[in-house]
Amino acid sequence: MNKFLLPLVALAVLASPCAHAQNLDAQRTAIRTAIDNAERGQFDANATAPLRNHPLYGWLEFSALRRNIDTLPTAQAQDFLKRYQGQAVAESFRSAWLPALARRQDWPTLQANWKASNDPGLRCAELNARQATGKADAQWTSDAQALWRGAAKSLPDGCDPVFAVLASRGGLTPALRWERIDAAADAQQPAVMRAAARGLPAAELAQANDYAAFVDKPDARALNWPKNERSRRIAVDGLQKLAKADPGAAELQLPQYAQALGLSAEQQGKVLYEIALWTVASYLPDSARRLAAVPESAYDERLHEWRTREAMARGDWPAALTAIRKMPASQRNDSRWRWFEGRLLEKTGKPAEATALYRAAANEPTFHGFLAADKLKQPYTLCPWNPGDSAAAKASVARDPALVRAIELFKIERPSWAAREWAEALTRFDDSQRRLAVEVASNNGWFDRAVFALKGPQELRLYNLRFPLHHDDTIRREAARNALDPAWIAAEIRAESIFNPNARSPANAMGLMQVLPATGASVARSIGLSGYGGASSLYDSDTNIAIGTAYLRQLMDKYSGLPYVTIAAYNAGPTPTARWQSQRPNYDPDFWIETISYKETREYVARVLAFSVIYDWRLNGNALTLSDRMVGKTEGARKAFSCQSAP
């Protein structure tokens, strides 16, 4: 065992909890500071000598070497790869070093240190290396052609020399160029189509550029295209792309191209599918008509759902029921559609037929399954699984060097590096060890591993791992302060950040409850939060929960105390929420949620409400009914949980 693991593992047994925590904190601060300094070009080998046996010392070295990657001596780089062979840090270094070797055209060294990769840039670097060292043999040609034909999208600039040599040797035949043009057309990449066409004979080049122009923006020149299968496929590609931006224009243009080029019913169906999809996704007035124009053979699960939602949004209950019954059995038997089939039977005067559907749905611990249990006035179905793993097995997994490094990297806020070490550890683990690794990670506050690494129906019953209890005191305090249910606050945190206080979204939402800086500042002022220091304060868990919970309270007051509308506004913002309210002002909550046009928000509202039920169970052993919870009733009867058929 690495000597430095003694403080990390043995002290957990030998030292007092307080001393152990202080020791670990000091070690983490030291390695974090050293890595930060190395990235700034301030690596001092003598000053960091005491860290040499730290599990993360390789990442410290990596940070220092990467800083000077373009001038790094080969011997030093190869020594690093040798010392850390088999570790994630070695492959991370290799991925940084090989492009540097390509930039300085050190082709022999690149070849000597090459390791198979799916990264197109690295593959091109290796092909350049082989070509430059006189190894552009038949295998080289085959490999270069495989890279070409598999690239529907643009490739890095480093690939241009590869394809130039391939073309000069006759390896980029017109047929191969057309193969990539076709792939790029399917991917709706007109610029790639044009680039791939260069080198075609003049007449073919003109036709290829015409095809690319059509995919970019359909025009009447296509009416005079050769009446062949390629023309038909590319016409479909271009019309599908147009349908996303302007479904009405695509609908108007389809008939003329269908007639001129002889589009098959299947090909026309693909375009009609996109026209209908991008119409109904915004509930435009022509939605029902355009959905009806799509052949049933062109429907997939996505469009089946939208046909059902569109009828629901119009309040056409018979049409919605018919739409569900046209779904394939595997889709129709999902708890969501069983629930809505039952609800629609009730709305069309057939309540007796709904009971069996509710019974089937109620067997699943989902949003719609919980609603079905409410309908039947029966306990919620929840079957926790206890694998009964031994402490020795867990301790063995916890000692895995890659897992130790992964957790330590997580602790010092290096999530991408932590994920690489985690992936490396999992390559050696069987299913039970993987499950135990999730438990070890959760015990160290790395809760999202339970979301990303647990698999299959049985592991999804590990509710203690999937729904962690953390920051309980703060959640309860802020929930009480704002007259909200703590289970709801926990569910929001679980849905927003999986209890990661350092989470940051592409939209710059920050912390546990993913609060935007502008919202944070506004809410902090409105509640008189002392000590709020700007956006960085949102990474403080107590501050984030205080602001996020107060913001939920403000939204609740704005939306008449209705949690399901409040949750939608928390995710999507006030403008779309106001639009959905005005479009369907008197809808039952379940139908209102299902007809939300944003997929993310539609799923988010149902997820948070279902998570609230599970967190209520975790906190209290029973739960407020979901039917009451959705509409803000907090004093109703509470419901027990039962397991009908757990193995």
Which sequence ranges carry the predicted segments?
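N-terminal leader/linker segments that initiate helical-solenoid repeat arrays
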Residues: 19-69, 382-403, 411
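Generic helix N-cap/helix-start motif at coil->alpha-helix transitions
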Residues: 22-30, 52-59, 71-73, 85-94, ...
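Catalytic glycan-binding domains that act on GlcNAc-containing polysaccharides
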Residues: 57, 62, 256-259, 263, ...
